[in-house]
Amino acid sequence: MVPADKKQSILFLVNPKSGVSKKKRVPQMVEQYVDHERYDVDICYTQYAGHAYELAKDAAANGVDVVVAVGGDGTVNEVGRALVHTGTALGVIPCGSGNGFARHLGIPIGIKKAIEFINDAEPVIIDYGKINGQPFFCSCGMGFDAVVSSDFAKGNRRGMLNYVKKSLVDWVKYKPETYVVETESMKEEFKAFVIACGNASQYGNNAYIAPFASMRDGLISVSILSPFNTYEVPMMATHLFTHTFDESNHVTTLTTSWI
């Protein structure tokens, strides 16, 4: 912790390509709304994939107190990976397509409100998961959502509408697969449309794939969605956006420390 009478250094890392919102006003808004009595401010724009990770890692090595990811969940993941087990705190100004990390933690959507939130915030410790040796902070998945996320990441357009378009295109050609799921308490075979492992409760846009996931319990919430018929899509979407995904007959839920 930084003594109360000492200013904290804070670096805003802006991803200009995330989401659909314009970020040209970020420097002006930071200058206008940040608490300059608390923070010494620096701002940097990322220039390529992985750049946020590099800049955040350098910042932590140089003793910067707070690094703020200005972007979506991909930017948060890059910055967060660089800051795990360091003395540098992660802040977020959510400007992505879904902003699942920020929404889960109650961070306001909107640059001005998010800056004001940072002005009054104190650091807390949160969990992260690991897959293939890489940390993740919201969720990781296998199946349909992984296919859509991969296709969305490869595209140049962002926003919820484009995500829905990608989903519809992939829906037509996707075939569910069979998985062997093993945890500390079970091992079972599932034919699944999606297997989602949630550290956070939602994908973003308040789509709750793991409604009761917590970032502070040391556990992963797993939702296994079995194949379903096309006419059931509206009901599945309703469950997803009304915090009742676990109540669907097509969903098996697990809570585990590893999978």
Describe the function of each predicted region.
Residues 157-162, 211-231:
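Gly/Ser/Thr-rich active-site loops/lids in small-molecule metabolic enzymes
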